[in-house]
Amino acid sequence: MAWLPQKDTLYPWLSIIDNVQLENVLFGNKSAKTTLQAKVLLEQVGMSEHLHKSYAQLSGGQKQRVALARVLMQNADLVLLDEPFSALDAISRYQLQNLAYELLKNKSVLLVTHDPQEALRLSQRIFVLRSPQPNQSALSDVIKPEGKAPRDLNQNNLWMLQQQLLNELLEGKR
């Protein structure tokens, strides 16, 4: 399993390439082959122009792109995305959602988000977690948005589903 958390977990003292191939660095398996693979992944996430930069010179969106490349480097069948886009501006968020969807399309992905629109854009099935009450499940019923993700938010049925999700969230607060 690979994990892309809300806050990047990059190491500021490592190069961008070594952050991507962190597992290989930690276990002493770093090689010319893994370095090349890291460079290819950084190119896929649009970071090849920034290889010379230090961690401190990267924007929040750039750090998340590097973190996404590290997730891809792990080549896990299951990927947990834990609020990975929440700290980004609207444009970076949209671009990274699309990029992550494209690069992870052949993986099983569990997306944790507090953003109903994000869930509706990217998910095949949506569950709402809530504090369980006696004789009640912690999971809501499944919501299945129509169409292929990533979806455009101008679809009428998505607005209705967004309201349904908000109602589920409100119900869980009571």
Predicted regions, residues:
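Hydrophobic anchor residue at the start of the ABC signature
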Residues: 4, 68
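Catalytic "switch" loops of ABC-type ATPases
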Residues: 6-11, 106, 115
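Short helical segment in ABC ATPase nucleotide-binding domains corresponding to the A-loop/adjacent helical element
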Residues: 15-25, 35
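Conserved ABC ATPase "signature" region
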Residues: 32-50
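Conserved signature/switch motifs of ABC ATPase nucleotide-binding domains
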Residues: 53, 74
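Conserved ABC ATPase signature
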Residues: 54-58, 62
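Catalytic Walker B motif of ABC-type/P-loop ATPase nucleotide-binding domains
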Residues: 79-83
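Helical segment within the ABC ATPase nucleotide-binding domain
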Residues: 93-105
